[in-house]
């Protein structure tokens, strides 16, 4: 369909282990500064993994009154903050500046993979020690996943689609991709889209540790997340949120919005293989579907922001999937994992990493993949090891994969 509507990125918001604003996070990322350290949120001494990528220096009252914040789990705080940043960055009209028609053309789709796990743990503890009367009437709306989108919609008066996708570690990316399709198909003109997560809690850490998915490099947390390194031993939990404002191109141009990049393609593909173990076919299908949707050849891509979790199986699997999808061109790609600095934000990963991919395209630079000390011979692509690289990026690709064999890929084009 030659007349399909174009989708562009006009706003960015970020709360992450490397910074609680877009500017701070991007600066630290380019400098190769890790946001991973020993856990301070609770006593993790009894766990095999005692470190994570925690958000630092974040004050929720910069974004909402404390009374409101007390009725939300932390993942909603992060998602709201990133959404507010993105809406402000885009200069979107809201409140009294909207009429009924324009309000209906703006929607919200910010998801989370797990939701309010810390609040669920806390409420369970209070129930056991103090009884049923201590369960807060705000417990359910404070912990369910769609409430980021709900709160953003209420705050700004956006009356278009208001929903949240939940697809494990592909959540944020799927929200962005599906939001873009809503614009492309003419359902809306603007979507606030991304992902958020806050699962650095005893059950969150303990569950992944029990599955032996986490690094146990407790003596050196900052070097623990080492995608594609020979000695990688698991991923590192992270937390935060990343949100994009997506907008129909003519709509953005008409109101004089700045344009960071174009969202040119979105693809998905299932492994249909195993609950948690990776498989090359699903990621390959996802990448090829995104390229088809963007109507570009793989040879036009210069930069790929990978899922790159630092797990022994996952990194090798993604490398092989990239080779299958891109053929000989895979060796010419710059493949980067920002998880080396942020850890893995699970449902928030696609949000913050899409922000980073857009910025890489906008500024024509690849962030480094830090902690590649001895590159795994089985992972033999160019991973932009340890130093940022100025480079031409006309087309960038973003991958995320999740438990259940769910995969997603976005294609961004330079504006």
Predicted feature descriptions by range:
Residues 1-9, 96-103, 294-300, 331, ...:
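Flexible, low-complexity linker/loop segments at domain and module junctions
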Residues 129-136, 177, 181, 185, ...:
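Glycine-/small-residue-rich "gating" segment that lines the acyl/pantetheine channel
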Residues 44-54, 116-119, 198-225, 268-285, ...:
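Active-site-adjacent elements of ketosynthase-type condensing enzymes
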Residues 79-93, 145-148, 153-156, 161-197, ...:
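Active-site-proximal alpha-helical scaffold in enzymes
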Residues 6-10, 37, 219-294, 303:
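Condensing-enzyme catalytic core mediating Claisen C-C bond formation in acyl metabolism
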Residues 135-140, 160-167, 229-233, 333-344, ...:
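Short pre-catalytic strand/loop immediately N-terminal to key active-site residues, enriched for Gly-Thr
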Residues 86-102, 252-259, 287-303, 325-329:
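Phosphate/pyrophosphate-binding loops at sites that engage ATP/ADP/AMP, CoA/4′-phosphopantetheine
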Residues 2, 9, 25, 30-167, ...:
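Conserved beta-ketoacyl condensing-enzyme motif
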